[in-house]
């Protein structure tokens, strides 16, 4: 009998939940990330955070700053800094496009989520975003509450 082929399902590893609330997302791009083996193991265990992280373009390379990856507890060879800069892997054309987009005033590169693709490689979804003002945030909260109330009313009838 032939064996059933098992499909690997990879779930989303980390998500920057505040990003969609604090920023207006204009464009997104998926990038690879350069990590060491022990860092990948920590991310698979969910011991990483994208809060307060951002990306910069320096000398034609994209770098991710302030991404917290807790050191893997069974790693005895090297101890890495949890918030070190990590290189993002993009094509030159994509980097040039991002550079032209963020050259506008008030735009930034913000990571939205990190996930494992079907091949098991860690990918990062970056967004070109513009910061929201306080009144925009209040409007978002109002809209969310109105949607919730509508759903409750629909459920009753």
UniProtKB/Swiss-Prot annotation:
Recorded superkingdom: Bacteria
Keywords carried by this UniProt record: Cytoplasm, RNA-binding
Cellular component, GO, one term: cytosol
Localization per record: Cytoplasm
One Gene Ontology molecular-function label: RNA binding
CDD domains listed in its UniProt record: SmpB
GO annotation terms (biological process): trans-translation
InterPro entries in alphabetical order: SmpB, SsrA-bd_prot, SsrA-bd_prot_CS
Pfam families: SmpB
Signal peptide: none
SUPFAM superfamilies referenced in this protein's UniProt entry, alphabetically: Small protein B (SmpB)
Record carries keyword Cytoplasm: yes
Function comment: Required for rescue of stalled ribosomes mediated by trans-translation. Binds to transfer-messenger RNA (tmRNA), required for stable association of tmRNA with ribosomes. tmRNA and SmpB together mimic tRNA shape, replacing the anticodon stem-loop with SmpB. tmRNA is encoded by the ssrA gene; the 2 termini fold to resemble tRNA(Ala) and it encodes a 'tag peptide', a short internal open reading frame. During trans-translation Ala-aminoacylated tmRNA acts like a tRNA, entering the A-site of stalled ribosomes, displacing the stalled mRNA.
PANTHER family cross-referenced by the UniProt entry: SSRA-BINDING PROTEIN, TMRNA-BINDING COMPONENT OF TRANS-TRANSLATION TAGGING COMPLEX
Family, similarity comment: Belongs to the SmpB family.
HAMAP family in alphabetical order: SmpB
Protein name per the record: SsrA-binding protein
